[in-house]
């Protein structure tokens, strides 16, 4: 009995130790190796197939600010806008031109994007809803000409002269004027005087933009976002020369049509196109760099933001991080991560704010860091973002924008300003000038929930708003009464929420395995400790009871014998009597 009890106690102790070793040493190592194997980018693996073509489309939601008082704004009144949306699109992503390095540690690729309208999720809204929005292309072109008038006029003067020289009658008249009159031509005057140059543009506005009576545009989401708003249609003379200069700028939101006209659209340049050549780390040599960008278009830096006075590239131009579609594994304890976004030509830091869950899967919540759209300037150590490309607008004395706004002029080749949706966290210098902004951190903040073992994004949203300054422009009569305003145009929510199939995949391949390993660990430890403690306890209890029985038995026997003798003596005495 003693030997059997001790054997069971020993087995229990061994089980407890085994459970501890398995749970805290063996299982973690095995899980670590399996996670690395599952997250590396190797051709032919399931992970590679999911990376090459996202197993589900992203949600691309667009909210458009409809202007309810356009004619009042033209008279200098405060603008009133109403958010209309979401207009929901499926965003499909497919890797093309995939090529691995010799050692397989890096992979080069481009990524095609395609947008398809999701009528069901957008209902009751449709792509053909009529809305009044800021005429972005006209406003942009006028501001660019205002800021660079002499340069612009000089460029298209030669185009106009060449055009006029091809017309025989004009050529003859021009020669006569040059011989008989010392007066300068209109084009020469335009070249010398900025104000007169703008007056020249003012005359041609109707031909270029189709007789606008406000700085706003009546359009549809389909036209404004993808199909394009036409302008520069059937233009001649100076208007044609101006349109040629617009075309030469190669602004990505403006494209040339077969008939020579131009079209502006917000996202047509993103549809059925790629956003450059990426080189990322496969994680084979260093799992901590899985999917980290090594090069974009063959470079490690941009030429968008200001560089250091020494000429060296600034931190603002540095390309690093992932593209946001995936992160390296083992995120537990990682306080910050970085995303590089080609849409806004910069990297963005996100910081750990706590834990969360998605469809029962534990996750880490990361949100945008305060320095993303915080104060900009030399005193904050980030003056490389102060490109000072939007003069005559509402800016600080050093030319930088106020808190919460970022000048994307160099990125868009147009005076576009980035904020968070509804100007969340934006300085009062901007928010006080417009009605209709209703910022809500939970709805308008950038965030992502990441599964900590694999680095898989479970749920998240990249939320940004695009704005433009609307202001008076000298010599452009249409803008005479405008008050300077940072005007909201659209905001987008580009996000991911894993579908049922992907949730099941993670649950089956990871969560259930981890749960099973936990059960095995704690069953071994629990049963082992129970046996190790219970068996000796049972043994000692039984032993104590056994000793107690042996001690009590002689006393009982003696008492019984004495009682018997007394009884016998009593009986004998009675008989004597």
Curated annotation (Swiss-Prot):
It is a multi-pass membrane protein. Pfam families: CD36. The chain crosses the membrane at residues 7-27, 520-540. Its main location: membrane. Disulfide bonds join 316-384, 345-411, 386-400. PANTHER family: SCAVENGER RECEPTOR CLASS B TYPE-1 SR-B1 (PTHR11923), SENSORY NEURON MEMBRANE PROTEIN 2 (PTHR11923:SF109). Plays an olfactory role that is not restricted to pheromone sensitivity. This is Sensory neuron membrane protein 2. It comes from Anopheles gambiae (African malaria mosquito).
